[in-house]
């Protein structure tokens, strides 16, 4: 039996909890834009007034306590120095390995040089009472269990180390289970056609039906009439809402905020001491590592949009080149007539020869700060939507030929650079069901394949725009247009071979739009079902995210059953808006892009650290839109040990050079004074985060890259010092073990 289980009645969140969660949501949404900017404190705990109030509160609890001798003994035991155990190598699949007392001895690794460790003695739970510490540990434990559950159901990633600790807390044996891992398409072999269709699986003829926003799979028509779907893991909305309300309450609890804030401050300070003591030893490791430096270790642009994957000079050069070659070619169609390229520019009253990067006006500047609407206008070269349709769209008069050529040129630059990869996003809007067919036809017909690129699908959250123009009757139709064609291609791949081949190259789904737009709607059991959402108002971020996740979960189970590649859910999150966005992502997203607002919530930031959720940060993009570069939390997150990578977002708007990813690294290195080891660690994180295949990750990171800590690092390929990897792993285990120690005291 597990050592610690929540009682059955606690699992069902009562009305009081739900009401509390609604109050928390309301307080997060109210004055969202201004409150945090006006406050001089990143988190409330830094405020000296609240600090003194907390100390007085703790003293009051201590003086009023009339506990028995047993309680005083338990309190004393909780306040003495605790020697924490850290799992090292896996000596057994059923038991966590331990070391001698943490303070008197240090862990040793065969491949890690000796280095100086930071040792903390004294009260590990200082600042909170023992009772509060137990409450905190219970809450963090359950939060990690919630994430683990949603990741495993959808074949997304959850690290081994916290999973081991969770099983240890439960009193259960941890067993490695690779069946929960995502499946990516292997790399194309030399001489193999990446668009071959002769190896597609056979059609199954299953029936599909969307019910309450989720696609259900039925073996035959009779099963549809009886409502007996195939036994796939379908989502449970009530359970999701209960879990969401629990997390809403958790991130608002005072003791949890105090404890997590103190732990994060400790992590930051500990890293700075580690750097001061071991920076030269890390550098010595890297200097002794032959044929590997920052330039030739693999790095992936984990967040980039295909429509802006080129820099402004590249786009300008291509426009001029196309005019030289295709001036008399019919390239554009209006209601009146078809236009040649020459006639189109004449209609716009301009000549390509006269264009400059300034007149092209696609670069974000001071005018776009806090103005996402103006930023979207930058996608129109020279402010002309006709040029955007011609050069940056897949569905136009020339079938997206120019856009395909630009992407191929960007891919050729990546191949030439050799050690850089990218994950461009292509858009599916959900306006009509034939979008998938058109996009896959564009992809296959133009033979868009690059060994240094993997692809993702982004879904803009613009239902309100389509509904106001009467393109869609309800939100359920948008979900149907997004997911039904993918399910059909999974069940009957030979019916649409182009889409089936295209899906092999897709690794995940992204949810994109301006997060600072508030919907004011809290997702609850009272929310309309997707087919009932006929309002012109946009659903909330959580509403979008849940139904995307729910369909991806069912889709992944079906594709895994068929031996096909699966998809990850990797949304934009935390760039702006309410903290509920990040809370939702913690539950159901494999990884996120941006994550700036984590600095406003110590609880969520600490949970992201414990679960090692990857975050693709884009400081140059944020600098033009939401946050000045010097205030970016990138360095703070890196020091604390969050799993962050660098990405470009939109090179056309934010970068100047031919290698925008290197530009991103170079500026971060200069502004934040990053060491070579820091940059290589971020690069290694990007490869772990991305959707390239297992075979390629083995080649880029080493045979044991799935192992966590120094055992999974091959310095010959990653150029990350083993000292750094050992420090990260031991610090991570220390924090996880604190939770385990806190729960032991409840027995």
UniProtKB/Swiss-Prot annotation:
Family matches, as Gene3D superfamilies: 4.10.800.20, Metal-dependent hydrolases
Organism: Homo sapiens
Binding sites annotated in the UniProt record for Zn(2+): 303, 305, 572, 649
Name listed for the protein in its UniProt record: AMP deaminase 1
Positions bearing Phosphotyrosine: 216
Cofactor note: Binds 1 zinc ion per subunit.
GO function term, MF aspect, one: metal ion binding
Catalytic residues (positions): 594 (proton acceptor)
Taxon lineage: Eukaryota, Metazoa, Chordata, Craniata, Vertebrata
Biological processes per GO annotation: AMP metabolic process; GMP salvage; IMP biosynthetic process; IMP salvage
Cofactor(s) named in the record: Zn(2+)
Top-rank taxon, per record: Eukaryota
Broad class of enzyme this protein falls into: hydrolase
Residues where substrate binds: 305, 374-379, 575, 650-653
The keyword Metal-binding is assigned to this record: yes
Enzyme Commission number(s) of this protein: 3.5.4.6
Function, in words: AMP deaminase plays a critical role in energy metabolism.
Annotated CDD domains: AMPD
Disease: Myopathy due to myoadenylate deaminase deficiency: A metabolic disorder resulting in exercise-related myopathy. It is characterized by exercise-induced muscle aches, cramps, and early fatigue.
Any Gene Ontology CC annotation: cytosol
Reaction equations catalysed: AMP + H2O + H(+) = IMP + NH4(+)
């Amino acid at each position: 039996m597990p050592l610690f289980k929540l009682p059955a009645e606690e699992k069902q969140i009562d009305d009081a909890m739900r009401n509390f969660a609604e109050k928390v949501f309301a307080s997060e949404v109210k004055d969202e834009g201004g409150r945090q900017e006006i406050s001089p404190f990143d988190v409330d705990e830094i405020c000296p007034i609240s600090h003194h109030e907390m100390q007085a509160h703790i003293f009051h609890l201590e003086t009023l306590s009339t506990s028995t001798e047993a309680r005083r003994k338990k309190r004393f035991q909780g306040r003495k120095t605790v020697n924490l155990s850290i799992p090292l190598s896996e000596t057994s699949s059923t038991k966590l390995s331990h070391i001698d007392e943490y303070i008197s001895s240090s862990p040793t690794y065969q491949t890690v040089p000796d280095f100086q460790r930071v040792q903390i003695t004294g009260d590990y739970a200082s600042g909170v009472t023992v009772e509060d510490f137990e409450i905190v540990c219970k809450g963090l434990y359950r939060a990690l269990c919630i994430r683990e559950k949603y990741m495993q159901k959808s074949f997304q990633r959850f690290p081994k180390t916290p999973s081991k600790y969770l099983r240890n807390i439960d009193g259960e044996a941890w067993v490695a289970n690779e069946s929960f891992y995502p499946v990516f398409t292997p790399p194309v072999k030399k001489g193999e056609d990446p668009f071959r269709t002769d190896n597609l699986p056979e059609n199954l003829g299953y029936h599909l039906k969307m019910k309450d926003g989720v696609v259900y799979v039925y073996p035959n028509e009779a099963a549809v009439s009886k409502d007996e779907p195939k036994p796939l893991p379908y989502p449970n909305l009530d359970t999701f809402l209960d879990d969401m309300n629990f997390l809403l309450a958790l991130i608002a609890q005072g003791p949890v905020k105090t404890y997590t804030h103190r732990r994060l401050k400790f992590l930051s300070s500990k890293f700075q001491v580690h750097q001061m003591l071991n920076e030269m030893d890390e550098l010595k490791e890297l200097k002794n590592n032959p044929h590997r430096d920052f330039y030739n270790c693999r790095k992936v642009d984990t967040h980039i949009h295909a429509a802006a994957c080129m820099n402004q000079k590249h786009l300008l050069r291509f426009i001029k080149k196309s005019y030289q070659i295709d001036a008399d070619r019919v390239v554009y169609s209006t209601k009146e007539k078809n236009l040649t390229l020459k006639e189109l520019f004449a209609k716009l009253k301009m000549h390509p020869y006269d264009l400059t990067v300034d007149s092209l006006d696609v670069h974000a500047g001071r005018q776009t700060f806090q103005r996402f609407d103006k930023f979207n206008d930058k996608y129109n070269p020279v402010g002309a939507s006709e040029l955007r349709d011609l050069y940056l769209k897949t569905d136009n008069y020339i079938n997206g030929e120019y856009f395909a050529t630009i992407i191929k040129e960007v891919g050729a630059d990546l191949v030439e650079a050799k050690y850089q990869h990218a994950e461009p996003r292509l858009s599916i809007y959900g306006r009509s069901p034939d979008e998938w067919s058109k996009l896959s036809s564009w992809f296959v017909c133009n033979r868009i394949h690059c060994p240094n690129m993997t692809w993702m699908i982004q879904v803009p959250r613009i239902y309100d725009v389509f509904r106001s123009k009467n393109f869609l009757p309800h939100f359920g139709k948008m979900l149907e247009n997004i997911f039904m064609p993918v399910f059909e291609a999974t069940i009957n791949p030979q019916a649409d071979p182009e889409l089936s081949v295209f899906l092999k190259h897709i690794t995940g789904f992204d949810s994109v739009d301006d997060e600072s737009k508030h919907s004011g709607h809290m997702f609850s059991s009272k929310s309309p079902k997707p087919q009932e959402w006929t309002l012109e108002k946009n659903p909330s971020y959580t509403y979008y995210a849940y139904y995307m996740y729910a369909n991806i979960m069912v889709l992944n189970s079906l594709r895994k059953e068929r031996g096909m590649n699966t998809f990850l859910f990797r949304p934009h999150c935390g760039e702006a808006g309410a903290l509920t966005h990040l809370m939702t992502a913690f539950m159901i997203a494999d990884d996120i892009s941006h994550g700036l607002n984590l600095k406003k919530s110590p609880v969520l930031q600490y949970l992201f650290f414990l679960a090692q959720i990857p975050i693709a940060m884009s400081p140059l993009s944020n600098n033009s839109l939401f946050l000045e570069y010097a205030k970016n939390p990138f360095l703070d997150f890196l020091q604390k040990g969050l799993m962050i990578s660098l990405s470009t977002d939109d090179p056309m708007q934010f970068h100047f050079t031919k290698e925008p990813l290197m530009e991103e690294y170079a500026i971060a290195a200069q502004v934040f004074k990053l060491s070579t080891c820091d940059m290589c660690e971020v690069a290694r994180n990007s490869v772990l985060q991305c959707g390239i295949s297992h075979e390629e990750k083995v080649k880029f990171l080493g045979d044991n890259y799935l192992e966590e800590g120094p055992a999974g690092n091959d310095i010959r390929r990653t150029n990350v010092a083993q000292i750094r990897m050992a420090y990260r792993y031991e610090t991570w285990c220390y924090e996880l073990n604190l939770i385990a120690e806190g729960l032991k005291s409840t027995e």
